[in-house]
């Protein structure tokens, strides 16, 4: 089933895109939520006319996204999280926390356009991708640090080496009796 998106849908497409989705997803979610309409011939003609009229507006939106991306260049974030003694985070760092840290730096972005892959569950350096426009993305480096004072590096535990016992008179007698 082809639908025309009426708004941006994460991991599917942007407003006014014509996308192919499964029938159930279109009929039971996108259309009832008002996020899409069925892509009939008349709807496609209306969309084409609207796109022609809004071509200069789309260019303006892209320009604003590029300006915002330029203002975000060079920003790096530090996020504090509660951790175990080995550096594993209790919970995980989410796009909400990234959006809050960006707001503290003076950059307002919607949390829905921030993508974190892979899930951030340990102390370390990561990168978040902010999708400002379908053609404009920004990578924001961030570091996750512990709120705790010390972090012990996890080391593989060494198995104790068994110490060979010297044969005593009792063990020698037991071996002889066993034979």
Curated annotation (Swiss-Prot):
Superkingdom, taxonomy of origin: Bacteria
GO biological process, one term: translation
Gene Ontology MF: a single term: structural constituent of ribosome
InterPro entries: Ribosomal_bL9, Ribosomal_bL9/RNase_H1_N, Ribosomal_bL9_bac/chp, Ribosomal_bL9_C, Ribosomal_bL9_C_sf, Ribosomal_bL9_N, Ribosomal_bL9_N_sf
GO cellular component terms listed in the entry, alphabetical order: ribonucleoprotein complex; ribosome
Region of interest (Disordered), residue spans: 155-179
Start-end of Acidic residues biased regions: 167-179
Phosphoprotein found in the keyword field: no
Keywords: Ribonucleoprotein, Ribosomal protein, RNA-binding, rRNA-binding
Record function comment: Binds to the 23S rRNA.
Family: Belongs to the bacterial ribosomal protein bL9 family.
Record's protein name: Large ribosomal subunit protein bL9
Lineage of origin: Bacteria, Pseudomonadati, Bacteroidota, Bacteroidia, Bacteroidales
Gene that encodes the chain: rplI
